[in-house]
Amino acid sequence: MSRIVNCVKLKREAEGLDFPPYPGELGTRIWQQISKEAWEEWKQIQTRLVNENRLNLADARARKYLQQQMERFLFEDGTVEAQGYVPPSA
C-alpha cells in the first residue's frame, strides 16, 4: 500500500516516496512532505542543472549548489531552470 502525503510542492495529496531520498534531516523532510511526482520533477531539473552547468559532483561547491536549488524548488515555490536550457519543441 502506498503512502499518501500532503505534497507542499504540488499543494495537494499525492503518493509519497518509499524512503527518504536524501541523507539527514532534509531527507526526512522530503520523505514526509514531497510526493513521488514532485521528486521526479526535481530529478529531471537536477539532471539539466548538472549538464547545462557542467557541474562536477565530486566538488563540494557543486553539491551545495544543487542542494540549495533542490530546497528552493521543493519548499520555496522557486522556479529552478538551467540557464541556456531550451525545452524540446512538440
Swiss-Prot record:
<comment type="function">
    <text>Could be a mediator in iron transactions between iron acquisition and iron-requiring processes, such as synthesis and/or repair of Fe-S clusters in biosynthetic enzymes.</text>
</comment>
<dbReference type="InterPro" id="IPR036766">
    <property type="entry name" value="Fe_traffick_prot_YggX_sf"/>
</dbReference>
<keyword id="KW-0408">Iron</keyword>
<comment type="similarity">
    <text>Belongs to the Fe(2+)-trafficking protein family.</text>
</comment>
<dbReference type="InterPro" id="IPR007457">
    <property type="entry name" value="Fe_traffick_prot_YggX"/>
</dbReference>
<dbReference type="GO" id="GO:0034599">
    <property type="term" value="P:cellular response to oxidative stress"/>
</dbReference>
<protein>
    <recommendedName>
        <fullName>Probable Fe(2+)-trafficking protein</fullName>
    </recommendedName>
</protein>
<dbReference type="Pfam" id="PF04362">
    <property type="entry name" value="Iron_traffic"/>
</dbReference>
<dbReference type="GO" id="GO:0005506">
    <property type="term" value="F:iron ion binding"/>
</dbReference>
<dbReference type="GO" id="GO:0005829">
    <property type="term" value="C:cytosol"/>
</dbReference>
